[in-house]
Amino acid sequence: MSTDSPNPKDLSRTAYDHLWMHFTRMSSYENAPVPTIVRGEGTHIYDDKGKRYLDGLAGLFVVQAGHGRTELAEAAAKQAQELAFFPVWSYAHPKAVELAERLAVEAPGDLNKVFFTTGGGEAVETAWKLAKQYFKLTGKPTKYKVISRAVAYHGTPQGALSITGLPALKAPFEPLVPGAHKVPNTNIYRAPLFGDDPEAFGRWAADQIEQEILFEGADTVAAVFLEPVQNAGGCFPPPPGYFQRVREICDQYDVLLVSDEVICAFGRLGTTFACDKFGYVPDMITCAKGMTSGYSPIGACVISDRLAEPFYKGDNTFLHGYTFGGHPVSAAVGIANLDLFEREGLNQHVLDNEGAFRATLEKLHDLPIVGDVRGNGFFYGIELVKDKNTKESFNEEETERVLYGFLSKKLFENGLYCRADDRGDPVIQLAPPLISHQETFDEIEQILRATLTEAWTKL
């Protein structure tokens, strides 16, 4: 065991020796330095050598208000002095109460109950467990299954991973929690039917959920988990009418609709909760990342009064909880973050500028490697292809060589931190801080243009 504090110049080596990085091919850094980020300011981050990068992913879809916000840091420090920790297990503390009330006010419909977690995966896990226990309490104990979409990512806990629609991510941990079933997603760029008619495609995609409910048996299905804009695979927005049809189906078969907004909530699409942007009211919302702009970890499941009702009767208890759920410091930062959103009009800023962001990214359509540009708000994916006419994607060797071997490193080297992702077809994912302006969009486009032009020569 090492007891010496690492010298700054040795941080990269020490990281390789001791820091097991998440979702990371560790062998990549055996003979290469680990990128080490030491500070952030506004829309940019800086490494340990002083080099500046545009944060094109808001950390990990998290840093909505930008880096270096003194008011958020001060909110954390003040709360840590006043009450650093107390659980919300049969007790309350002021910041958890206030944040829960603020979220309930922002949520649509009768979603007035807030169950805090420490992150998004825990929020998804909470929603599934709550759905199961709800149906047991209401006399329908056989309703335990869930339906989600192909290629969708919903988290890493055992239940959330079962809901996830990425077989390669799940394979090492099988067998997982049984009862999670998949339907097609809303990738209209590769639609098997109705690719030229978004409304018809949306109806078809929603109807696949009904078909799966009928196939499994409506008396066995508890919930449907959907992101407003699906992240994995490269930002699939919902076709017109999709969520309205899904809501009808869920109501018809007494199935709960869970809007997984871990990424999409808190301004990413220009509204506090993304379901509002697409005009549907779910039974539960899972959220996390942007709630504090990343200045302290927290997550939540926001729940309708109807679902909460049986748990508020007699000796019934939701048999679930987390030590750090609703942590006082995180809750205080969440409140300060919501105050900042209101003060600076961040949601409206996204709505006012999302068209400019899209238009700037769509300039890349003139590159032969760019097949599709899709997304919503400040949340976009750029799908890469070998042939624009046939939409031919990369093969496995090309993905390894071009996406991993070249693009991931070269984009960062050229000053853009974003994500080159192959969880579906190869895409570049972009989600800059919500304080971004045209200057930020132009910087992203210029770096992408130069790097993708070079990548094309390597196919």
Which sequence ranges carry the predicted segments?
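Conserved N-terminal phosphate-binding loop of PLP-dependent enzymes in the Aspartate aminotransferase
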Residues: 2-459
